[in-house]
Amino acid sequence: MGLSDGEWHLVLNVWGKVETDLAGHGQEVLIRLFKSHPETLEKFDKFKHLKSEDDMRRSEDLRKHGNTVLTALGGILKKKGHHEAELKPLAQSHATKHKIPIKYLEFISEAIIHVLHSKHPAEFGADAQAAMKKALELFRNDIAAKYKELGFHG
């Protein structure tokens, strides 16, 4: 299930574009997630009061959390599948503290793909999208394995 060097190159090439504005990209990803899957908003006490897209766009906290999410994901992607050290604390917090189901990680993966395609169509064509989907699936599978080790079946 690993990615080839060429696939990692495609993933990290577009990720370089994301890193020019992590907070902005992250905010867009979270807005897309919450609009497409409103049930995910219930996992975020800090954001439950944000009922409209305008509210979400005005929220500095949402922007900051988007930055946090994409910073963590970028750190994992840059490890090219060798992300055990980065993944363990993330899985621990998402399983035991936040209780985030794997399904929600699928939802945010979809949101990431959508946002990257809309913001960077030239760098995120079919091959790059396929590579990113594969990288995100690798991440989710590894998180799911950690969840299982922790006894969380979300």
Swiss-Prot record:
<dbReference type="GO" id="GO:0098809">
    <property type="term" value="F:nitrite reductase activity"/>
</dbReference>
<dbReference type="GO" id="GO:0020037">
    <property type="term" value="F:heme binding"/>
</dbReference>
<comment type="subunit">
    <text>Monomeric.</text>
</comment>
<keyword id="KW-0349">Heme</keyword>
<comment type="similarity">
    <text>Belongs to the globin family.</text>
</comment>
<keyword id="KW-0963">Cytoplasm</keyword>
<keyword id="KW-0479">Metal-binding</keyword>
<keyword id="KW-0560">Oxidoreductase</keyword>
<keyword id="KW-0408">Iron</keyword>
<dbReference type="InterPro" id="IPR009050">
    <property type="entry name" value="Globin-like_sf"/>
</dbReference>
<dbReference type="InterPro" id="IPR000971">
    <property type="entry name" value="Globin"/>
</dbReference>
<feature type="modified residue" description="Phosphoserine">
    <location>
        <position position="4"/>
    </location>
</feature>
<dbReference type="GO" id="GO:0070062">
    <property type="term" value="C:extracellular exosome"/>
</dbReference>
<protein>
    <recommendedName>
        <fullName>Myoglobin</fullName>
        <ecNumber>1.7.-.-</ecNumber>
        <ecNumber>1.11.1.-</ecNumber>
    </recommendedName>
</protein>
<feature type="binding site">
    <location>
        <position position="65"/>
    </location>
    <ligand>
        <name>O2</name>
    </ligand>
</feature>
<feature type="domain" description="Globin">
    <location>
        <begin position="2"/>
        <end position="148"/>
    </location>
</feature>
<dbReference type="GO" id="GO:0005344">
    <property type="term" value="F:oxygen carrier activity"/>
</dbReference>
<keyword id="KW-0813">Transport</keyword>
<comment type="function">
    <text>Monomeric heme protein which primary function is to store oxygen and facilitate its diffusion within muscle tissues. Reversibly binds oxygen through a pentacoordinated heme iron and enables its timely and efficient release as needed during periods of heightened demand. Depending on the oxidative conditions of tissues and cells, and in addition to its ability to bind oxygen, it also has a nitrite reductase activity whereby it regulates the production of bioactive nitric oxide.</text>
</comment>
<dbReference type="InterPro" id="IPR002335">
    <property type="entry name" value="Myoglobin"/>
</dbReference>
<keyword id="KW-0597">Phosphoprotein</keyword>
<feature type="modified residue" description="Phosphothreonine">
    <location>
        <position position="68"/>
    </location>
</feature>
<feature type="binding site">
    <location>
        <position position="65"/>
    </location>
    <ligand>
        <name>nitrite</name>
    </ligand>
</feature>
<keyword id="KW-0514">Muscle protein</keyword>
<dbReference type="GO" id="GO:0046872">
    <property type="term" value="F:metal ion binding"/>
</dbReference>
<dbReference type="GO" id="GO:0016528">
    <property type="term" value="C:sarcoplasm"/>
</dbReference>
<dbReference type="GO" id="GO:0019430">
    <property type="term" value="P:removal of superoxide radicals"/>
</dbReference>
<dbReference type="Pfam" id="PF00042">
    <property type="entry name" value="Globin"/>
</dbReference>
<dbReference type="GO" id="GO:0004601">
    <property type="term" value="F:peroxidase activity"/>
</dbReference>
<feature type="binding site" description="proximal binding residue">
    <location>
        <position position="94"/>
    </location>
    <ligand>
        <name>heme b</name>
    </ligand>
</feature>
<keyword id="KW-0561">Oxygen transport</keyword>
<dbReference type="GO" id="GO:0019825">
    <property type="term" value="F:oxygen binding"/>
</dbReference>
